[in-house]
């Protein structure tokens, strides 16, 4: 303390003497300089050193925590990126599987259609029908004409006193009619099916 007081008093003494020599100036300049130096005992010095070391350790700890937080953030970003990539890969895999299943369904559908068409036989429909028609020339005589497509034959019946007519009978009387048998008809239908496939 005494050292600090001596310095301040000596500076103040110098300034007024300089001012006194300069009589031509009307202004007075006063400068105050304070110099403080604190002297510590060895115990206080070691205590301050330990406080300073603790402060530096605390600053280093905060810096370490900040770097760990930055590393953790980078790790989280990396994990999120990997999770996003895994999710995207999973979605792409699911989409590929759906596309594959759809292609399989289309192929199976086409195969089913092809096998159905190739394994089915087209058979002619055999129907039996009969028709009758008569025309009366005399009240007492009637005739019936029966036609059956089962055996692809046609018949005509005529009577002595009158005539019974039908389209099938007229065709049979006019001349020979080409008759398709079941085997020719089936072969024709199979050839038509082969052309369509």
UniProtKB/Swiss-Prot annotation:
Recite the UniProt keywords alphabetically.
Answer: Cell membrane, Glycoprotein, GPI-anchor, Lipoprotein, Membrane, Signal, Virulence
Q: Which residues are glycosylated?
A: 110, 114, 152
**Induction line:** Induced in biofilms and in oralpharyngeal candidasis. Repressed by alpha pheromone.
Q: Where is the lipid attached (GPI-anchor amidated glycine)?
A: 169
Localized where? Cell membrane
Q: Which residues form the propeptide?
A: 170-197
Q: Name the membrane topology term.
A: Lipid-anchor; GPI-anchor
Q: Which residues form the signal peptide?
A: 1-20
Disulphide bridges, residue numbers? none
Q: What does this protein do?
A: Predicted GPI-anchored protein which may have a role during host infection.
Official protein name in the record: Predicted GPI-anchored protein 34
